[in-house]
Design a protein with these regions (language model features):
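Pre-NBD coupling/linker segments of ABC/ABC-like ATPases
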Residues: 2-3, 242
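ABC family nucleotide-binding domain
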Residues: 6-230
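C-terminal boundary and immediately downstream tail of ABC-type ATPase nucleotide-binding domains
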Residues: 220, 227, 231-252
C-alpha cells in the first residue's frame, strides 16, 4: 500500500435501508489507492451491501459517497457519475455471470470494445494477456459450461481487469466454489494485491484475509464494529462482538 492520502473511496455517514431494516448505519470509510481492505462479518451483517453501494448496484438513502472523484447521490440520482464509476471500478461476484453463448476470450473482450472503444485486435491482445495472467490462457476458445467453477471465476476476474479498473470489488468470490477450487482463485487475487491493485474484498476466508489485507473491517448489524491491521484484529480483537465472531469462524 502506498501513502497517497487522497482516498479513492470516501463514505461519510452512509445509511441504507431495505424497508424497515437498517442495513448500513452511519458508515464512515476511506480507502486509499493501493490499499487492500477485507470486510468480514456474519451473514446478513451488511458486508455485501456496503461494497454494492460503492459501484451503485445498491442505492443508499442518506450520507455522502465519492468514488474516484465522482459523487454518488442518495436514491440513485447520479446517472453520469454512475457511468464513469462503472468504467473505473471492476467487480467479481459470488456467481460468475459469464455470457454462456460467448467463448472465454469473447467474454473478456466484449466490454473493452463496447464501452472503451478498443479495436478488436487490441482487445484480443489484451484479453489473451489477462487470461495468461490469471492462469487460463489455454481455455480461451472454450465456452463457460466447459470450465470448472474455479476457471469460470478466473475468467470473471480477467473480464473485470480488461476494463483497466482503478478499484476492484470482490463479493465473496469463492463462496460458490468447491473447496479444491478456492485456492486457484485466491492465488490470482494474491497476485493482484502484490501488483498494487486497490481491492475491497468481502470473504469468509480468514487465512487469506490475514495474509493479503492491509486492513480488516468487521461489520456487525450494519455498523463498523472494529477495524485495523489483520495481525491486530485477528490476534487481539478489542470488541466483544469481534471476539465472538472470530471464535466461531476460526474453530472451523
Amino acid at each position: 500500500m502506498n501513502d497517497t492520502t487522497q482516498p479513492i473511496v470516501r463514505m461519510q455517514q452512509l445509511n441504507k435501508h431495505f424497508g424497515s431494516l437498517h442495513v448500513l448505519n452511519n458508515i464512515d470509510l476511506d480507502i486509499v489507492p493501493g490499499e487492500v481492505v477485507v470486510i468480514i462479518g456474519a451473514s446478513g451483517s451488511g458486508k455485501s451491501t456496503l461494497i454494492r453501494c460503492i459501484n451503485g448496484l445498491e442505492e443508499f438513502q442518506s450520507g455522502n459517497l465519492v468514488v474516484d472523484s465522482s459523487e454518488l447521490l442518495p436514491y440513485g440520482k447520479s446517472t453520469q457519475a454512475l457511468q464513469k464509476i462503472r468504467t473505473e471500478v471492476g467487480m467479481v461476484f459470488q456467481q460468475f455471470n459469464l455470457f454462456p453463448h460467448l467463448s472465454v476470450l469473447d467474454n473478456v473482450t466484449l466490454a473493452p470494445m463496447k464501452v472503451r472503444g478498443l479495436s478488436r485486435d487490441d482487445a484480443i491482445s489484451s484479453g489473451k494477456r489477462l487470461l495468461d495472467r490469471v492462469g487460463i490462457a489455454d481455455q480461451a476458445d472454450k465456452y463457460p459450461s466447459h470450465l470448472s467453477g474455479g476457471q469460470q471465476q478466473r475468467v470473471a476476474l480477467a473480464r473485470a481487469l480488461a476494463m483497466e479498473p482503478r478499484l476492484m470489488l470482490f463479493d465473496e468470490p469463492t463462496s460458490a466454489l468447491d473447496p479444491e477450487m478456492i485456492g486457484e482463485v485466491l492465488d490470482a487475487m494474491r497476485e493482484l494485491a502484490k501488483e498494487g491493485m486497490t481491492m475491497v474484498i468481502v470473504t469468509h476466508e480468514m487465512g487469506f484475509a490475514r495474509e493479503v489485507a492491509d486492513r480488516v473491517i468487521f461489520i456487525h448489524k450494519g455498523e463498523i464494529a472494529e477495524q485495523g491491521p489483520p495481525e491486530k484484529l485477528f490476534d487481539t480483537p478489542q470488541h466483544e462482538r469481534t471476539q465472538s465472531f472470530l471464535a466461531r469462524v476460526l474453530k472451523h
